[in-house]
Swiss-Prot record:
GO molecular function, one term: toxin activity
Protein name, per record: Non-structural glycoprotein 4
Annotated Ca(2+) binding sites: 120, 123
Glycosylation sites: 8, 18
Membrane topology: Single-pass type III membrane protein
Post-translational modification: The N-glycosyl content is primarily Man(9)GlcNAc, with a small amount of Man(8)GlcNAc.
Family label: Belongs to the rotavirus NSP4 family.
Pfam family, one: Rota_NSP4
GO cellular component terms, A-Z: extracellular region; host caveola; host cell rough endoplasmic reticulum membrane; membrane
Subunit: Homotetramer. Interacts with the immature particle in the viroplasm. Interacts with host CAV1, early and late in infection. Interacts with host integrin ITGA1/ITGB1 heterodimer. Interacts with host integrin ITGA2/ITGB1 heterodimer. Interaction with microtubules blocks trafficking to the Golgi apparatus.
Keywords: Activation of host autophagy by virus, Calcium, Enterotoxin, Glycoprotein, Host endoplasmic reticulum, Host membrane, Host-virus interaction, Ion channel, Ion transport, Membrane, Metal-binding, Secreted, Signal-anchor, Toxin, Transmembrane, Transmembrane helix, Transport, Viral ion channel, Virulence
Length: 175
């Protein structure tokens, strides 16, 4: 690990890359040299930047796995951005956070739907009571005795002797 952060080693790797690129460049059919050179430069820079960072992170952090995972994800996301991709790699922690946020929002919406449903049910019950009060209720026979002030009127069947007491009778007078 000491060798990776050594300046002489870095210079020898750069020299090796340059020699390799010059041998590739001598081939006249090599048209993609600038692209290969830029990719190799980026990879080497990431390699040189990530090794000391990872060493320090592993020594100082207690949760080294999370730090290493975060560094690797960050490196890959940087490479994807350099390649022109808009997608990014996410870790399980980020996915779990997003899922928790989605679940929380769904619970909030379900509570809102429950409240609205309860209100709608109450409104329907109120409208039913109002409708029941406004509907005309039919009864078999209407008692009109209170309206025409004839409470003591009897029918033919209700009279005791079976005769109408209001019919005129023959009256004989004694002299």
């Amino acid at each position: 690990m000491e060798k990776l952060t050594d300046l002489n080693y870095t210079l020898s790797v750069i020299t090796l890359m340059n020699n390799t690129l010059h041998t590739i460049l001598e081939d006249p059919g090599m048209a993609y040299f600038p692209y290969i050179a830029s990719v190799l430069t980026v990879l080497f820079a990431l390699h040189k930047a990530s090794i000391p960072t990872m060493k320090i992170a592993l020594k100082t952090s207690k949760c080294s796995y999370k730090v290493v995972k975060y560094c690797i994800v960050t490196i890959f996301n940087t490479l994807l951005k350099l390649a022109g991709y808009k997608e990014q790699i996410t870790t399980k922690d980020e996915i779990e956070k997003q899922m928790d946020r989605v679940v929380k929002e769904m619970r909030r919406q379900l509570e809102m739907i429950d409240k609205l449903t309860t209100r709608e049910i109450e409104q329907v019950e109120l409208l039913k009571r109002i409708y029941d009060k406004l509907t005309v209720q039919t009864t078999g026979e209407i008692d009109m005795t209170k309206e025409i002030n004839q409470k003591n009127v009897r029918t033919l069947e209700e009279w005791e002797s079976g005769k109408n007491p209001y019919e005129p009778r023959e009256v004989t007078a004694a002299m």
